[in-house]
Amino acid sequence: MSSQPVTKAEGVAASGDTRAAFLRKAGLGSAALVAGGSLAGVLPGAAKAHTTPTPPSDVDMLNYALTLEHLEATFYVQGLQVFSRGDLTGAGFLKGFGGRIRSNVYDYFLLIRDHELQHVSTLESLIRGLNGEPVPACTYNFQETAFTSVEQFVSVAQVLENTGVMAYDGAIAHIEAAELLTAGATIATVEARHASYLNLINGDVPFPEAFDTPMAPRKICELVDREFIVECPFKLAAFCELLPDTVTPR
């Protein structure tokens, strides 16, 4: 991985060990790998993967998005079981804000959680509608990476949401069906709203650049696997290798 500094356009400014490390590793300078294959052979009981590499299908790309949404939804569900309303409204990083922002923060986190759960449900329905098999959720290590303090929880939330925007931006060109493009875009814009709010309460610019920076699906997949995932009921590493390593189709 490149150790070059990460710009605002690649996510958010690093200001915390976990966030800094995560975004630094998300730099766009690593060597490219060859993409190809399909989800066959990755899910339990699936057919053996084709020996000739093929571009990922729309179902594969939806399962990629679902992998990220499972992670985000679980993050908020578990995090809001660890941290109470008082933990969030009384957090030190909110002292510079007015009473309205402080009093609303817990309810807004609940709303973000509900959005992510709805994204999971919608993606699962879309995948089944295409006769595909939705990937299940994995086991995550949020206790060590995000739940050490309320400040760390909110900081990692910012990282995840900004990364989600880069992920959708990087995946959209690999979707073929027009109706799926619309579905993906409507999720991506909500992720961007989450990211803007979390940038603000973390003391960063809510909308730092005129253009967001897309990130290749394989890079995102490998990044979240390395940083947050303990194990999965499917072969996540193999799935990551099947995803595109560029933001534009070859």
Predicted feature residues:
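All-alpha RGS (Regulator of G-protein Signaling) helical domain and cognate RGS-like helical scaffolds
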Residues: S2-T18, G27-A31, L39-R250
